[in-house]
Design a protein with these regions (language model features):
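A common structural junction motif
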Residues: 76-80
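Short S/T/G/P-rich N-terminal loop/turn motif that feeds into the first structured element of a domain
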Residues: 1-54, 61-73, 84-103
Length: 103
């Protein structure tokens, strides 16, 4: 079964436009590096402007594949950019799938 990797961050609502801009800009830095990784099935980047939250969710073929993001230079470079605008991150978690629905 696939592995779901979840990275969550929080930001002050006054910085929502900065957080959104940086998330959009991160696509340029990350897209080709991510698509080159073996095992990537899906990748989602989202923002909740009401609660001041952002999320990166990815789905991987295996736990080993998901952990490749732990050392991906392009990904590691993004964190301090977001933190400079006040984004704080929770611990990244990797969830082994127990069941799914795919309509």
């Amino acid at each position: 079964m696939p592995v779901v990797r979840i990275s969550k961050g929080k930001f002050d609502l006054a910085n929502a436009s900065d957080a959104e801009r940086l998330l959009l800009e991160s696509e340029r830095a990350l897209r080709s590096a991510l698509t080159a990784l073996p095992g990537l099935l899906h990748y989602y980047v989202g923002i909740d402007r009401i609660h001041g939250a952002l999320t990166n969710v990815s789905v991987w073929a295996s736990l080993e594949d998901a952990h490749r993001l732990d050392t991906l230079p392009q990904m590691l470079a993004q964190r301090p950019i977001l933190e400079a605008t006040g984004v704080t991150f929770e611990v990244i978690t990797n969830h082994e799938t127990l069941w799914t629905i795919t309509p």
